[in-house]
């Protein structure tokens, strides 16, 4: 009789725990499920929330990703020393000129190769290349490396090659990624569904 009572006690506890775990799993799925706005293009199933960050523009102003919700963001990890990155600059200039009015924001996160690369030398590079979109750098030291590591973790693979470029939709989800340079035409084809809809 005692054994039956003990077994039924553990069975009741076990069921209760299973129900709690099941309920917790349901809650976490509900919380993490992206909200799809009616006038947005269908977000891919693999889309993930872009990690928020704060970095500094070359002009010295703070840039916080989450303050750009409602915009379509082309996030580019690049370096002034990277030749393939340089190839994309004219295409990014054209894209921002043509589609900023539609809500496009292009943001370059600068990965410095050495301590000799300063905000001043990056500003000179921007002037030489007529860069007309936002370029970000560290606030103090190494924040851009932390952001790069966080994005590598978010997309499931470290960002070791640059340029690496991500499209972030108006609700802040990473919907497309590229490793290596791409043309204006390729970027526009993938950006177009997100630019033509507004939040």
Residue positions per predicted region:
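A short beta-strand-turn-helix
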Residues: 47, 52-73, 96-99
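Conserved redox-active cysteine motifs that mediate thiol-disulfide chemistry
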Residues: 69, 77-94
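N-terminal targeting signals for export/organelle localization
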Residues: 1-52, 177, 199
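Structural microenvironment flanking redox-active thiols in thiol-disulfide oxidoreductases
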Residues: 87-131, 141-152
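Thiol/disulfide oxidoreductase modules built on the thioredoxin-like
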Residues: 129-131, 138-192
């Amino acid at each position: 009789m005692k054994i039956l009572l003990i077994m039924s006690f553990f069975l009741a506890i076990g069921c209760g725990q299973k129900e709690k775990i099941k309920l917790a799993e349901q809650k976490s799925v509900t919380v993490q499920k992206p909200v799809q706005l009616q006038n947005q293009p269908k977000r891919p199933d693999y889309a993930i929330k872009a990690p928020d960050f704060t970095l500094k523009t070359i002009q010295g102003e703070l840039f916080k990703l989450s303050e750009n919700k409602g915009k379509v963001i082309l996030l580019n990890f690049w370096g002034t020393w990277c030749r393939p990155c340089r190839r994309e600059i004219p295409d990014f200039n054209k894209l921002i000129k043509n589609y900023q009015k539609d809500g496009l924001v292009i943001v370059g996160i600068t990965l410095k190769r050495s301590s000799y690369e300063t905000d001043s030398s990056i500003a000179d590079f921007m002037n030489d290349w007529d860069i007309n979109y936002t370029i970000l750098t560290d606030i103090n030291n190494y924040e851009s490396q932390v952001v790069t590591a966080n994005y590598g973790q978010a997309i499931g693979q470290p960002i070791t090659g640059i340029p690496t470029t991500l499209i972030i939709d108006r609700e802040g989800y990473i919907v497309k990624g590229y490793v290596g340079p791409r043309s204006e035409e390729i970027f526009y084809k993938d950006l177009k569904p997100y630019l033509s809809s507004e939040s």
